[in-house]
């Protein structure tokens, strides 16, 4: 376990960040209808999108690829214009409670650009279907099918120096949950199903897990930014799941046994003011109990989704932590 700073008793944030958090929370709360649906028309008023850009900006260009137009399954490829061969590939799943946002939402477009530039890596950000219009297991199906499409078409998608044998999954919040569950599916597949894609690491940034029993963090961190029991309960209901479902409470009473799977080494990121932190720590402990390699990185003075705010020093620190993890996993292949 590693901690990047000493804990404070109170969350202290820059004014810019506080304003952004207030706007995001107000927007999502007002979009959620009492009947469990979402006012998408209202959201579109605030959901600014970044178009793909084939011209490099800060050495990174972007392009979009359609997997299945009928279900709006596509991904954005972030290409770092750097020298060298065998550049890793990071498959990224965005957060948003399974119900909000997309790869071309400005916050996630910016995050993936930073990943591509700083690691460096080819980043593939998957657009999956959203709840409540599309319930479980649509999001996991889309993640798996996107990987299968990359496996079968990588020659026409990725440049020659992109090395799919150095493939990582990454995701934050709901995206961390999707990354975990899609990784299990891939590990269960026959080896002949994925010959190009070799999953060697998973970067789980404040993954969205839960359970029927409330944790101490859920009880104590009332009023924390973005996340509350009411909001998370709404998201699980939108997915059509109870909170002890195997996809929600991954180490709980209905947990999937991964002890016999070649599950990738995992980096789990936790923040001190995130009401989900106990579930994330439990995930880390469960991975270890299953005999899997895992590392826990803690930011005691941060909140849920802190890393999408580039003005925070911890956001930059996390990018470098992720780079270290990627470099160490790649180096282990030749050790």
From Swiss-Prot:
Q: In which tissues is it expressed?
A: Expressed in roots, flowers and siliques.
Instruction: Give the E.C. number(s).
Output: 3.1.1.1
- Name the active site residues: 173, 274, 304
**Which enzyme class, named as a word?**
hydrolase
Q: Which UniProt keywords apply?
A: Acetylation, Hydrolase, Serine esterase
* Motif Involved in the stabilization of the negatively charged intermediate by the formation of the oxyanion hole: where in chain: 94-96
- Please give the coiled-coil regions recorded for this protein: none
Protein's UniProt keywords contain Acetylation = yes
Looking up InterPro entries in the UniProt record yields:
AB_hydrolase_3, AB_hydrolase_fold, Carboxylest/Gibb_receptor
Named from the GO MF annotations, one term is:
carboxylic ester hydrolase activity
Q: Name one GO biological process term.
A: pollen tube growth
Location of N-acetylalanine modifications:
2
Under catalytic activity, the entry for this protein gives: a carboxylic ester + H2O = an alcohol + a carboxylate + H(+)
Q: State whether keyword Hydrolase applies.
A: yes
Q: Which family does it belong to?
A: Belongs to the 'GDXG' lipolytic enzyme family.
Q: Which PANTHER family match?
A: ARYLACETAMIDE DEACETYLASE, CARBOXYLESTERASE 18-RELATED
What task does this protein carry out? Answer: Carboxylesterase acting on esters with varying acyl chain length.
What name does UniProt use for this protein?
Probable carboxylesterase 18
The organism encoding this protein is Arabidopsis thaliana (Mouse-ear cress)
Q: Which gene encodes it?
A: CXE18
């Amino acid at each position: 376990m590693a901690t990047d700073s000493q804990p404070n008793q109170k969350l202290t944030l820059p004014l810019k960040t506080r304003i952004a958090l207030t706007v995001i929370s107000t927007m999502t709360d007002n979009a959620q209808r009492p009947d469990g649906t979402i006012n998408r028309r209202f959201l579109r008023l605030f959901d600014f999108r970044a178009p793909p850009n084939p011209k490099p900006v800060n050495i990174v260009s972007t392009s979009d690829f359609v997997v299945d137009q009928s279900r709006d399954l596509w991904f954005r490829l972030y290409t770092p214009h750097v020298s060298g061969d065998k550049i890793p590939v990071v498959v990224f799943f965005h957060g948003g409670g399974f119900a909000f946002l997309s790869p071309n939402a400005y916050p996630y477009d910016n995050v993936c650009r930073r990943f591509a530039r700083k690691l460096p890596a080819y980043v593939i950000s998957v657009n999956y279907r959203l709840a409540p219009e599309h319930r479980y297991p649509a999001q996991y199906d889309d993640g798996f099918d996107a990987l299968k499409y990359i496996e079968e078409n990588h020659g026409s998608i990725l440049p020659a120096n992109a090395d799919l044998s150095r493939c990582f999954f990454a995701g934050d919040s709901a995206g961390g949950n999707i990354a975990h569950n899609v990784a299990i599916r891939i590990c269960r597949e026959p080896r002949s199903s994925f010959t190009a894609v070799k999953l060697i690491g998973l970067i789980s940034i404040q993954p969205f897990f839960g359970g029927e029993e409330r944790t101490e963090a859920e009880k104590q961190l009332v009023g924390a930014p973005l996340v509350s029991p009411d909001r998370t309960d709404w998201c699980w209901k939108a997915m059509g799941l109870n909170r002890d479902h195997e996809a929600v409470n991954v180490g709980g009473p209905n947990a999937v046994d991964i002890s016999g799977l070649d599950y990738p080494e995992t980096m789990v990121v936790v923040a001190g003011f995130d009401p989900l932190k106990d579930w994330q720590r439990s995930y880390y402990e469960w991975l270890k109990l299953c005999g899997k390699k895992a590392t826990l990185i803690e930011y005691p003075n941060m909140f849920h989704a802190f890393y999408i705010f580039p003005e925070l020093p911890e956001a930059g620190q996390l990018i470098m932590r992720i780079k270290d993890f990627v470099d160490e996993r790649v180096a282990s292949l030749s050790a």
